[in-house]
């Protein structure tokens, strides 16, 4: 997971950077809504490649999805470790039991 932590740290460092100096800084400067929109676009592109069955393009789009997910988290000040902790908490539970235990509403 080191690469994801490294990428998350780089994204976090770009928060205060000049938007003209970095794509990440430019995206973050546009706000969390734009970051979420871009994540959604990349997720759809990955879905399309998964349906097509193009492995190389799916790998590439998957990398874009991970990057934009981390940008979206950073835009809302959510740490990657918080998401990983939630995954760790769910590990070992059946998906059905985990979903049933979620708060309603």
From Swiss-Prot:
It catalyses: 1-(5-phospho-beta-D-ribosyl)-ATP + H2O = 1-(5-phospho-beta-D-ribosyl)-5'-AMP + diphosphate + H(+). It comes from the Bacteria. Pfam families: PRA-PH. Its EC number is 3.6.1.31. InterPro entries: HisE, PRib-ATP_PPHydrolase-like. One of its GO terms (molecular function) is phosphoribosyl-ATP diphosphatase activity. It is found in: Cytoplasm. The keyword Hydrolase applies. Keywords: Amino-acid biosynthesis, ATP-binding, Cytoplasm, Histidine biosynthesis, Hydrolase, Nucleotide-binding. The keyword ATP-binding applies. GO terms for cellular component: cytoplasm. GO terms for biological process: L-histidine biosynthetic process. Pathway: Amino-acid biosynthesis; L-histidine biosynthesis; L-histidine from 5-phospho-alpha-D-ribose 1-diphosphate: step 2/9. Belongs to the PRA-PH family. This is Phosphoribosyl-ATP pyrophosphatase. It comes from Ruegeria pomeroyi (strain ATCC 700808 / DSM 15171 / DSS-3). The gene is hisE.
């Amino acid at each position: 997971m080191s690469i994801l932590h490294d990428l998350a740290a780089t994204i976090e460092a770009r928060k205060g950077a000049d938007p003209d100096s970095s794509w990440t800084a430019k995206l973050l400067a546009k706000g969390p809504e734009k970051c979420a929109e871009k994540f959604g676009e990349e997720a759809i592109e990955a879905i399309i490649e998964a349906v097509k069955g193009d492995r190389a393009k799916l790998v590439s789009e998957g990398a874009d999805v991970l990057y934009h997910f981390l940008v979206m988290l950073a835009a809302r000040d959510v740490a990657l470790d918080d998401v990983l902790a939630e995954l760790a908490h769910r590990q070992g539970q059946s998906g059905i039991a985990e979903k049933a235990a979620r708060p309603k509403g």
